[in-house]
Amino acid sequence: MICLTPMVSLPLVTTTDSESTGPRKNHLLNWSLDQLKDWLQEQGQKPFRAKQIRRWLFSGRATSFEEMTDLPAKLRAQLEEHFAIFNATEAVVSKSKDGTEKILVRLADGGEVECVLLRDGPRRSICVSSQVGCAMGCVFCASGLDGVDRNLTGGEILEQMLRLQQRLPADERLSHIVMMGMGEPLANLPGVLSALDVARSEDGLGISPRRITISTVGLPPAIDKLAAAGIPYNLAVSLHAPNDELRSELVPVNRKIGIEPVLQAADRYFHASGRRLTFEYVLLGGINDGDEHARQLSQILRGRSVMMNVIPYNPVAGLPYRTPSGAAIARFRAILESAGVNVNFRQRKGDEINAACGQLRRNRGEVKATK
């Protein structure tokens, strides 16, 4: 267990071009490499400068065009006139004793999302949001309490990554990306894939697809589209229950889908990508943590190449759910392992700053308890 300590909340005001008066500039992170090359040619500049600019953003961690010292002064002035590197502000930065850091990012239109940097030994992982809010309605999760406003652009997703990277010392680099922040990533597949295309590229963050995980409640058509994209990202399916009756209570979107179609789509993704599947299961005390639940879960996973990530519930103020007892957790694990299921109980990180699984939220106001 992690010893809980009071939250350290550090208000951070960051001035960006998006805050200035006058016409809003183009968000540079929304522009593809080809679009940037075309723009450079229109400005009378060489197209190869596009990769130089990318390297400054992702490897050089530049936050202004003036820092891009190997670019001609005229080009730096042109970039400054037309583009903003960042299009949002850091409203609040919170840091926990275990090294986890969370940023509340305020977007140009006033929307807010949260993203997290997790430190675990040599690993430097980031948890990134894909939507402002979430429409999936999982009853125990903070992210969907206020519904969903809109999808994030690829640039807004990349901006979260860069802001989290800036929290690292110069001799450290990001190692893993998990699309497990606010929102349903597969409900914003174009934005997510465009951001990850940059994140995995050599002139981007250079992170292998094998170190990138996309989480989903299980949207079969979108899972098939992800498979068709042909990039072997890790897929994590949020299951949370071993039968349709209970899952439909906890994950309302299941009423329109059902567990079996989700499992079949996950199987298709496994065969297309060659990547072992991960299933996520938030363990709720007295609700889905019983011996029979564990046995049913073992049955539906039998014969599948999977890793089962079990996450003891991280409390959300105002919601009527609790973390299971130590005895219930131990029994649940024992039943899964005795059935041959590869199981990992996720270590709690960042819960003291509401940065743990299921705690990310855009509105920290009063929570109305759900039934």
Curated annotation (Swiss-Prot):
Keywords for this protein: 4Fe-4S, Cytoplasm, Disulfide bond, Iron, Iron-sulfur, Metal-binding, Methyltransferase, rRNA processing, S-adenosyl-L-methionine, Transferase, tRNA processing
Entry binding sites for [4Fe-4S] cluster: 134, 138, 141
Cofactor: [4Fe-4S] cluster
UniProt GO BP: rRNA base methylation; tRNA methylation
Xref: Pfam families: Radical_SAM, RlmN_N
Reaction equations catalysed: adenosine(2503) in 23S rRNA + 2 reduced [2Fe-2S]-[ferredoxin] + 2 S-adenosyl-L-methionine = 2-methyladenosine(2503) in 23S rRNA + 5'-deoxyadenosine + L-methionine + 2 oxidized [2Fe-2S]-[ferredoxin] + S-adenosyl-L-homocysteine; adenosine(37) in tRNA + 2 reduced [2Fe-2S]-[ferredoxin] + 2 S-adenosyl-L-methionine = 2-methyladenosine(37) in tRNA + 5'-deoxyadenosine + L-methionine + 2 oxidized [2Fe-2S]-[ferredoxin] + S-adenosyl-L-homocysteine
GO cellular component terms given for this protein: cytoplasm
Function: Specifically methylates position 2 of adenine 2503 in 23S rRNA and position 2 of adenine 37 in tRNAs.
NCBIfam families listed in its UniProt record: rRNA_mod_RlmN (TIGR00048)
Protein's recorded name: Probable dual-specificity RNA methyltransferase RlmN
